[in-house]
Amino acid sequence: MEKNPQALVDGFNRKVDYLRMSVTDRCDFRCVYCMAEDMQFLPRQQILSLEELYQVAERFVALGTRKIRLTGGEPLVRQGIVELCGRIAALPGLRELCLTSNGSQLGRLAQPLFDAGVSRLNISLDSLDPERFRALTRTGDLKQVIAGIDAARAAGFRRTKLNAVVLKGRNDDEIVDLVRFAIDRELDISFIEEMPLGVISEHERGESFCSSDDVRNRLAEHFTLVESAESSQGPARYWRLAEAPSTRVGFISPHSHNFCATCNRVRLTVEGRLLLCLGNEHSVDLKQVLRQHPGDSARLEKAIRDAMQLKPYRHHFEVGGEVQILRFMNMTGG
């Protein structure tokens, strides 16, 4: 491993070299596990400007961050997103600029994003049934999303991966079909355990929870799964399919197999809070530093370094019971 004297290290000697940045809390979908249907979004003055987002990215890269992922909300509804991607991708030392999307805007933006320097895309796809897709997203058009997926494939990204949040009784019967869809397009796919963020109304999380082990066991009835040591620097554990070597299946398991011991990431919310853990409220207000001391990169760097010592060893997600994290996923950075 290369040594960087500037590298960020937390209090448990974990190297932090991956930043997830939310560029907006807004989204053109209202997914049932992500936000309330009548979600009230932040006023413009409360969110970081594109320049402020860039300043944070620049300091993190100077401190050894090698991977940045832009998230939302839906990042592609933020005006100026392609230009922001171009500026961040050009930062010396950054190895990968990635982006997570619901796919709705990729038909028009996939190629510009690739040209700007985005190397990897994650695209959410929870169902292949148009009516069910609409029910899960409340507003989404499956045909439009599939067109976006195909546009991403044509653009030439280093890697395009599908993400599916599995909910028992709502879409768990589509697990095999989703993998076959990924195989047909030579894409990777990850199945994600639902995360207990925010108060939701459409289902009980304890009843809808579907573990990664359950998903994997069902897939093993149809495919030959071969465990892989490959990593994307994120939380997913990957398996190869003997029948389809071009497709990997990943499992993101915050409940059943938490990945806290090797956590290498922090999150920036669009309102400038640096979250040290997805499942805790530990945070540092970087917006205050940016606005009270504009252009002071040394002060911003110190705030980032000091924040690392607040990073807890692990989260304490619970499947059932009272919700402990009240912020919704779109406010966190999905």
From Swiss-Prot:
HAMAP family: MoaA_B. It catalyses: GTP + AH2 + S-adenosyl-L-methionine = (8S)-3',8-cyclo-7,8-dihydroguanosine 5'-triphosphate + 5'-deoxyadenosine + L-methionine + A + H(+). S-adenosyl-L-methionine binds at residues 33, 73, 124, 195. Keywords: 4Fe-4S, GTP-binding, Iron, Iron-sulfur, Lyase, Metal-binding, Molybdenum cofactor biosynthesis, Nucleotide-binding, S-adenosyl-L-methionine. Its EC number is 4.1.99.22. Monomer and homodimer. Its cofactor is [4Fe-4S] cluster. Gene3D superfamilies: Aldolase class I (3.20.20.70). Residues 11-235 form the Radical SAM core domain. Catalyzes the cyclization of GTP to (8S)-3',8-cyclo-7,8-dihydroguanosine 5'-triphosphate. Belongs to the radical SAM superfamily. MoaA family. Coiled coil: none annotated. [4Fe-4S] cluster 1 binds at residues 27, 31, 34. GTP binds at residues 20, 69, 100, 161, 265-267. The keyword RNA-binding does not apply. It holds the Pfam family Fer4_12. One of its GO terms (biological process) is Mo-molybdopterin cofactor biosynthetic process. Pathway: Cofactor biosynthesis; molybdopterin biosynthesis. Binds 2 [4Fe-4S] clusters. Binds 1 [4Fe-4S] cluster coordinated with 3 cysteines and an exchangeable S-adenosyl-L-methionine and 1 [4Fe-4S] cluster coordinated with 3 cysteines and the GTP-derived substrate. InterPro entries: Aldolase_TIM (IPR013785), Elp3/MiaA/NifB-like_rSAM (IPR006638), MoaA (IPR013483), MoaA_NifB_PqqE_Fe-S-bd_CS (IPR000385), MoaA_twitch (IPR010505), MoCo_biosynth_MoaA/MoaC (IPR050105), rSAM (IPR007197). [4Fe-4S] cluster 2 binds at residues 260, 263, 277. GO terms for molecular function: 4 iron, 4 sulfur cluster binding; cyclic pyranopterin monophosphate synthase activity; GTP 3',8'-cyclase activity; GTP binding; metal ion binding; S-adenosyl-L-methionine binding. This is GTP 3',8-cyclase.
